[in-house]
């Protein structure tokens, strides 16, 4: 902290720190009725799961002009990396950096789509991300059903 000029604060005081970005990376539901009005950041970008205690918190962030990058889009890179590591371990193959990079590029495209659609549709990012995820899951289910019919 001394080298960068950062200030160390108690965990519960983090919500009151003036910052550009709030990055919840450990505990879920840190964006809740008790903390929402204390956060002054203009963006929330973190890797913790389930950052929004309730969906209406995402709506309130949107109404305040706070950019919220949905947690499962932000932390998807970790899952992608682990998938490649596990595949290499389970198959005796090598870690596939090219596959990881391709998937990460698609993840960035998804985040771009979430942000662009949020702006153009006037809807919170968490709603857009959920809609994209549901559409992809439904498409995968339909593809699987077609494969099973063909088998």
Where are each of the predicted segments found?
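Rossmann-like adenosine-cofactor binding region
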Residues: 1-70
